[in-house]
C-alpha cells in the first residue's frame, strides 16, 4: 500500500506521470483543474515523475502512466489516463 504523510487536506492525491509526454502533461493540467474546482483549499496533490523516481512508482505498484492515486481518505483508489473525463474521475475519487 502507498505510504502517505500526515496531511490536513481532506483528499490526498498522487499523480504519476512520465516526463513531458503529452498524456502526462494533459493529466497534470486536468488534475490541477479538478482539484482547484472541486476540492479547493482541501486537497494535496503531489506529482511524481516516474522517469525520475522509478523505485517510488514501483513501490506504489504503478506500471502505467498517467495514474492518479487517491491516498486519503481510504481506501486507495486509482484512475488511469489523462483525466479528461472529469465526471468519471470524480466518481472514482469520491467512491461512488
Residue ranges and their predicted role:
Residues 83-96:
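Ser/Thr/Gly-rich flexible loops in soluble cytosolic domains mediating phosphotransfer, phosphorylation
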Residues 48-64, 95:
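Thioredoxin-like thiol-disulfide oxidoreductase module
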Residues 33-44:
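Conserved helix-turn-beta segment immediately C-terminal to the redox Cys motif
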Residues 12, 42-47:
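Residues at or immediately flanking beta-strands
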Residues 65-77:
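A short, hydrophobic beta-strand/beta-hairpin element that forms part of a small beta-sheet core
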Residues 1-4:
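Short beta-strand/turn micro-motifs at beta-sheet edges
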Residues 6-35:
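Local sequence-structure signature of Cys/Sec-based thiol-disulfide redox active-site neighborhoods
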Amino acid at each position: 500500500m502507498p505510504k502517505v504523510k500526515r496531511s490536513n487536506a481532506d483528499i490526498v492525491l498522487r499523480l504519476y506521470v512520465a516526463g513531458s509526454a503529452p498524456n502526462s502533461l494533459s493529466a497534470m493540467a486536468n488534475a490541477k483543474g479538478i482539484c482547484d474546482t472541486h476540492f479547493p483549499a482541501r486537497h494535496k496533490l503531489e506529482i511524481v515523475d516516474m522517469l525520475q523516481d522509478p523505485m517510488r512508482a514501483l513501490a506504489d505498484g504503478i506500471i502505467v502512466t498517467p495514474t492518479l492515486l487517491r491516498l486519503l481518505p481510504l481506501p486507495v483508489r486509482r484512475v488511469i489516463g489523462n483525466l479528461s473525463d472529469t465526471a468519471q474521475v470524480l466518481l472514482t475519487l469520491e467512491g461512488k
